[in-house]
Design a protein with these regions (language model features):
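Glycine-rich phosphate/adenylate-binding loop
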Residues: 2, 113-119, 124-129, 139, ...
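Hydrophobic/small residue at the entry helix of a nucleotide-binding pocket
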Residues: 35
Length: 218
């Protein structure tokens, strides 16, 4: 193991064979907000050889309290491009595909067929593209993990990793379950969710944001 190997600690933990698998993997991360940006960075630091990141949003002042790409110097800039520069600075050898696009039902199949993905991280916060991504990934037998809702919640001790069908106290999980059932999806889906009940005082009803009926404290 070379002294200048920046992945030395990870290799000590996981072993050489697992590191080879990680370096040979192509991971798709969709949604680069409060969850996806951090997940993508950890994958980058873990040594994933190839990654595709997808998000059409630009950095807004309301992102400053929690989102990785949000700084005064990056306001108004595309999140995907800001993060791509950061990830390449961390791991110059990573093969990075940057897609600053908004996923819709009709362009998800094209995305999933554009490359051979080994794993998908779903960090989308709107129902339709989230469910359609899950549906299309399962059709193609691509492994996927999905992030559920954390808005209006603050107790990190209640974060859980479970099957979608076993979640509770999570409005997004409930909505995703209903939509997937209508789409005929009955397979297990690993998700990250919180058992904490949302604080109603931290929810602001609004119709101003695209595909969102409320804004939650985060």
């Amino acid at each position: 193991m070379e002294e200048n190997n920046w992945q030395q600690r990870t290799e000590l933990l996981l072993g050489e064979e697992k590191m080879k698998r990680i370096r040979a993997s192509h991971v798709l991360v969709v949604g680069l907000g409060g969850v996806g940006a951090y997940a993508a960075e950890m994958l980058c630091r873990a040594g994933v050889g190839r990654m595709t990141i997808v998000d059409a949003d630009t950095v807004q002042p309301t992102n400053m309290n929690r989102q990785l790409p949000a700084m005064h110097s990056t306001l108004g800039m595309p999140k995907a491009e800001v993060l791509a520069a950061r990830y390449k600075d961390i791991n110059p050898d990573i093969e990075l595909t940057v897609l600053p696009v908004y996923l819709k039902d009709e362009n998800i199949p094209e995305l999933l067929d554009s490359a051979k993905f080994d794993f998908i991280v779903d960090a989308i916060d709107t129902i339709s593209p989230k469910c359609f991504l899950i549906y299309e990934a399962m059709k193609r037998h691509i492994k996927i993990v999905s992030s559920m809702g954390a808005g209006a919640k603050s107790d990190i001790a209640q974060i859980r990793f479970a099957d979608l069908w076993d979640t509770y106290h999570c409005g997004l999980s409930k909505a995703v379950r209903k939509r997937l059932q209508k789409m005929g999806v009955k397979r297990k889906l690993p998700v990250v969710f919180s058992t904490e009940q949302a604080d109603p005082k931290a929810v602001l009803l609004t119709d101003d944001e695209r595909n969102k009926k409320s804004t939650c404290g985060t």
